[in-house]
Protein backbone atom coordinates (compact mmCIF):
# COMPACT_ATOMS: atom_id res chain seq x y z
CA UNK A 1 0.00 0.00 0.00
CA UNK A 2 2.73 2.46 0.96
CA UNK A 3 4.75 1.68 -2.16
CA UNK A 4 1.72 2.40 -4.33
CA UNK A 5 1.00 5.58 -2.37
CA UNK A 6 4.55 6.80 -2.99
CA UNK A 7 4.20 6.25 -6.74
CA UNK A 8 1.03 8.30 -7.16
CA UNK A 9 1.50 11.61 -8.96
CA UNK A 10 -1.14 14.30 -8.76
CA UNK A 11 -4.38 14.28 -6.75
CA UNK A 12 -5.52 11.14 -4.95
CA UNK A 13 -8.90 10.02 -3.65
CA UNK A 14 -9.87 10.13 0.03
CA UNK A 15 -10.20 6.37 -0.06
CA UNK A 16 -6.56 6.03 -1.14
CA UNK A 17 -5.51 8.41 1.63
CA UNK A 18 -7.44 6.52 4.32
CA UNK A 19 -6.09 3.12 3.29
CA UNK A 20 -2.57 4.56 3.26
CA UNK A 21 -3.14 6.03 6.73
CA UNK A 22 -4.19 2.60 7.99
CA UNK A 23 -0.94 1.15 6.66
CA UNK A 24 1.02 3.88 8.47
CA UNK A 25 -0.91 3.24 11.70
CA UNK A 26 0.00 -0.45 11.52
CA UNK A 27 3.67 0.54 11.18
CA UNK A 28 3.48 3.14 13.97
CA UNK A 29 4.35 5.95 11.53
CA UNK A 30 1.10 7.92 11.33
CA UNK A 31 2.67 10.95 13.05
CA UNK A 32 6.13 10.68 11.55
CA UNK A 33 5.59 9.87 7.87
CA UNK A 34 2.04 10.83 6.86
CA UNK A 35 2.91 14.22 5.42
CA UNK A 36 5.75 12.89 3.31
CA UNK A 37 3.05 11.44 1.04
CA UNK A 38 0.64 13.19 -1.28
CA UNK A 39 -2.43 14.39 0.66
CA UNK A 40 -3.93 16.53 -2.09
CA UNK A 41 -7.26 14.87 -2.78
CA UNK A 42 -9.36 15.04 -5.91
CA UNK A 43 -11.86 17.93 -5.65
CA UNK A 44 -15.49 16.80 -5.38
CA UNK A 45 -17.48 16.91 -8.59
CA UNK A 46 -21.21 17.58 -9.01
CA UNK A 47 -23.03 14.27 -9.24
CA UNK A 48 -25.60 14.26 -12.02
CA UNK A 49 -25.71 10.52 -12.52
CA UNK A 50 -28.47 8.48 -10.89
CA UNK A 51 -25.81 6.02 -9.65
CA UNK A 52 -23.72 7.49 -6.81
CA UNK A 53 -20.71 5.61 -5.43
CA UNK A 54 -19.22 6.89 -2.17
CA UNK A 55 -16.54 5.64 0.19
CA UNK A 56 -19.26 4.14 2.35
CA UNK A 57 -20.33 1.97 -0.59
CA UNK A 58 -16.84 0.77 -1.50
CA UNK A 59 -14.45 0.43 1.43
CA UNK A 60 -16.13 1.76 4.57
CA UNK A 61 -16.44 -1.68 6.19
CA UNK A 62 -12.73 -2.35 5.65
CA UNK A 63 -11.80 1.10 6.99
CA UNK A 64 -14.05 0.83 10.04
CA UNK A 65 -12.73 -2.65 10.83
CA UNK A 66 -9.12 -1.45 10.80
CA UNK A 67 -10.04 1.28 13.29
CA UNK A 68 -11.70 -1.30 15.55
CA UNK A 69 -15.23 -0.08 14.79
CA UNK A 70 -16.81 -3.47 14.21
CA UNK A 71 -20.42 -2.32 14.68
CA UNK A 72 -20.16 0.18 11.83
CA UNK A 73 -18.15 -2.30 9.74
CA UNK A 74 -20.89 -4.92 10.10
CA UNK A 75 -23.55 -2.34 9.32
CA UNK A 76 -21.87 -1.26 6.08
CA UNK A 77 -21.13 -4.86 5.08
CA UNK A 78 -24.78 -5.82 5.56
CA UNK A 79 -25.92 -2.78 3.59
CA UNK A 80 -23.73 -3.92 0.71
CA UNK A 81 -25.33 -7.36 0.92
CA UNK A 82 -28.78 -5.79 0.69
CA UNK A 83 -27.83 -3.74 -2.38
CA UNK A 84 -25.59 -6.15 -4.28
CA UNK A 85 -26.04 -9.56 -2.66
CA UNK A 86 -23.56 -11.59 -0.61
CA UNK A 87 -19.98 -11.89 -1.81
CA UNK A 88 -16.83 -13.65 -0.63
CA UNK A 89 -15.37 -10.28 0.35
CA UNK A 90 -18.38 -9.36 2.50
CA UNK A 91 -18.47 -12.79 4.14
CA UNK A 92 -14.80 -12.45 5.02
CA UNK A 93 -15.41 -9.04 6.56
CA UNK A 94 -18.33 -10.33 8.64
CA UNK A 95 -16.14 -13.23 9.78
CA UNK A 96 -13.31 -10.95 10.90
CA UNK A 97 -15.72 -8.66 12.75
CA UNK A 98 -17.27 -11.65 14.52
CA UNK A 99 -13.81 -12.87 15.57
CA UNK A 100 -12.85 -9.43 16.87
CA UNK A 101 -16.14 -9.16 18.78
CA UNK A 102 -15.63 -12.60 20.32
CA UNK A 103 -18.79 -13.92 18.61
CA UNK A 104 -17.62 -17.48 18.05
CA UNK A 105 -20.93 -18.88 16.81
CA UNK A 106 -21.31 -16.18 14.17
CA UNK A 107 -17.71 -16.62 13.05
CA UNK A 108 -18.17 -20.38 12.71
CA UNK A 109 -21.36 -19.84 10.71
CA UNK A 110 -19.58 -17.60 8.19
CA UNK A 111 -16.58 -19.92 8.00
CA UNK A 112 -18.85 -22.90 7.37
CA UNK A 113 -20.44 -21.12 4.41
CA UNK A 114 -17.07 -20.04 3.00
CA UNK A 115 -15.59 -23.53 3.40
CA UNK A 116 -18.07 -24.83 0.82
CA UNK A 117 -16.29 -22.84 -1.88
CA UNK A 118 -13.04 -24.14 -3.35
CA UNK A 119 -11.09 -20.88 -3.45
CA UNK A 120 -11.95 -19.80 0.12
CA UNK A 121 -10.99 -22.96 1.97
CA UNK A 122 -7.39 -21.92 2.55
CA UNK A 123 -8.52 -18.63 4.10
CA UNK A 124 -11.01 -20.51 6.29
CA UNK A 125 -8.19 -22.74 7.56
CA UNK A 126 -6.13 -19.63 8.37
CA UNK A 127 -8.98 -18.07 10.38
CA UNK A 128 -10.08 -21.18 12.27
CA UNK A 129 -7.24 -21.10 14.88
CA UNK A 130 -8.25 -17.55 15.87
CA UNK A 131 -11.86 -18.64 16.36
CA UNK A 132 -10.85 -21.66 18.43
CA UNK A 133 -8.42 -19.60 20.53
CA UNK A 134 -5.40 -21.61 19.38
CA UNK A 135 -3.70 -18.46 18.07
CA UNK A 136 -3.96 -15.13 19.94
CA UNK A 137 -5.30 -12.20 17.94
CA UNK A 138 -2.42 -10.02 19.16
CA UNK A 139 0.00 -12.05 17.05
CA UNK A 140 -1.99 -11.63 13.83
CA UNK A 141 -1.08 -8.88 11.36
CA UNK A 142 -4.75 -8.71 10.43
CA UNK A 143 -6.16 -8.41 13.97
CA UNK A 144 -3.42 -6.88 16.13
CA UNK A 145 -4.05 -3.17 15.54
CA UNK A 146 -7.84 -3.38 15.07
CA UNK A 147 -8.02 -5.27 18.38
CA UNK A 148 -5.97 -2.60 20.14
CA UNK A 149 -8.14 0.23 18.79
CA UNK A 150 -11.28 -1.82 19.55
CA UNK A 151 -10.23 -2.06 23.20
CA UNK A 152 -8.83 1.45 23.66
CA UNK A 153 -11.50 3.54 21.95
CA UNK A 154 -15.16 4.11 22.71
CA UNK A 155 -17.74 2.48 20.47
CA UNK A 156 -19.29 4.69 17.81
CA UNK A 157 -23.05 5.10 18.06
CA UNK A 158 -25.65 6.79 15.89
CA UNK A 159 -24.80 7.46 12.26
CA UNK A 160 -21.84 8.70 10.26
CA UNK A 161 -24.06 10.65 7.82
CA UNK A 162 -22.02 8.97 5.05
CA UNK A 163 -18.83 10.79 6.18
CA UNK A 164 -16.52 7.92 7.07
CA UNK A 165 -13.23 9.79 7.41
CA UNK A 166 -14.61 12.72 9.40
CA UNK A 167 -16.51 10.39 11.75
CA UNK A 168 -13.37 8.43 12.63
CA UNK A 169 -11.13 11.48 12.96
CA UNK A 170 -13.59 13.31 15.22
CA UNK A 171 -14.04 10.25 17.41
CA UNK A 172 -10.31 9.61 17.86
CA UNK A 173 -9.17 13.20 18.35
CA UNK A 174 -11.31 13.27 21.52
CA UNK A 175 -10.17 9.83 22.72
CA UNK A 176 -7.90 9.77 25.78
CA UNK A 177 -5.90 6.59 26.15
CA UNK A 178 -2.71 5.47 27.87
CA UNK A 179 -1.76 2.98 25.16
CA UNK A 180 1.16 4.46 23.16
CA UNK A 181 0.05 3.15 19.77
CA UNK A 182 -3.60 4.09 20.18
CA UNK A 183 -2.63 7.50 21.55
CA UNK A 184 -0.54 8.19 18.46
CA UNK A 185 -3.66 7.52 16.37
CA UNK A 186 -5.56 10.07 18.48
CA UNK A 187 -2.77 12.62 18.11
CA UNK A 188 -2.63 12.07 14.36
CA UNK A 189 -6.39 12.55 14.01
CA UNK A 190 -6.20 15.83 15.95
CA UNK A 191 -3.59 17.06 13.47
CA UNK A 192 -5.67 15.98 10.48
CA UNK A 193 -8.71 17.85 11.84
CA UNK A 194 -6.53 20.88 12.72
CA UNK A 195 -8.25 21.17 16.07
CA UNK A 196 -5.95 23.28 18.23
CA UNK A 197 -7.43 22.36 21.62
CA UNK A 198 -7.50 18.64 20.88
CA UNK A 199 -4.00 18.76 19.42
CA UNK A 200 -2.38 20.29 22.50
CA UNK A 201 -4.39 18.02 24.78
CA UNK A 202 -3.10 14.99 22.88
CA UNK A 203 0.44 16.45 22.89
CA UNK A 204 0.28 16.59 26.68
CA UNK A 205 -1.01 13.02 26.83
CA UNK A 206 1.77 11.83 24.49
CA UNK A 207 4.37 13.47 26.74
CA UNK A 208 2.90 11.82 29.85
CA UNK A 209 3.09 8.39 28.21
CA UNK A 210 6.44 8.80 26.43
CA UNK A 211 8.57 11.07 28.64
CA UNK A 212 11.84 9.58 27.42
CA UNK A 213 10.94 9.67 23.72
CA UNK A 214 11.09 12.52 21.25
CA UNK A 215 7.88 13.67 19.64
CA UNK A 216 7.23 12.35 16.11
CA UNK A 217 8.53 14.58 13.33
CA UNK A 218 5.18 15.93 12.15
CA UNK A 219 4.12 16.69 15.73
CA UNK A 220 7.29 18.74 16.26
CA UNK A 221 6.56 20.63 13.05
CA UNK A 222 2.98 21.32 14.12
CA UNK A 223 4.07 22.57 17.55
CA UNK A 224 6.63 24.96 16.10
CA UNK A 225 4.12 26.20 13.52
CA UNK A 226 1.51 26.90 16.20
CA UNK A 227 3.91 28.80 18.45
CA UNK A 228 6.05 30.74 15.97
CA UNK A 229 3.76 31.15 12.95
CA UNK A 230 0.26 31.22 14.40
CA UNK A 231 1.48 32.92 17.62
CA UNK A 232 -0.66 30.75 19.89
CA UNK A 233 -0.33 32.25 23.40
CA UNK A 234 0.40 30.37 26.61
CA UNK A 235 2.43 27.53 25.07
CA UNK A 236 5.72 26.57 26.74
CA UNK A 237 7.93 24.35 24.59
CA UNK A 238 10.77 24.00 27.09
CA UNK A 239 9.78 20.38 27.80
CA UNK A 240 10.01 19.35 24.14
CA UNK A 241 13.00 17.44 22.76
CA UNK A 242 13.31 18.70 19.20
CA UNK A 243 15.32 16.95 16.51
CA UNK A 244 18.51 18.85 15.71
CA UNK A 245 17.64 19.01 12.03
Residue spans of the language-model regions?
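Surface-exposed patches in mature extracellular/periplasmic domains of secreted proteins
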Residues: 199-202
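Active/binding-pocket-proximal capping segment
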Residues: 113, 204-209
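Non-catalytic terminal/accessory regions
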Residues: 184, 197, 210, 216-224
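Short, surface-exposed linear patches
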Residues: 46, 212-213
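Polybasic, proline/glycine-rich intrinsically disordered low-complexity segments
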Residues: 216-245
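Soluble catalytic regions of membrane-associated enzymes that act on cell-envelope
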Residues: 1-149, 153, 157, 174-175, ...
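Outer-membrane pore/translocation modules
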Residues: 155-171
Amino acid sequence: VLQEAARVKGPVTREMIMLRDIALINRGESCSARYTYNNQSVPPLPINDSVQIRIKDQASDLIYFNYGETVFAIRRAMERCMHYGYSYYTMRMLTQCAILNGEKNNALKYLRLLSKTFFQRKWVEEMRPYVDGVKPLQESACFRMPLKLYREGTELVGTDDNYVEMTLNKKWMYTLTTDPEAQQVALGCAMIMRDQRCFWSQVQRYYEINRDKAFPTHVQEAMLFDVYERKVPGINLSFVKFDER
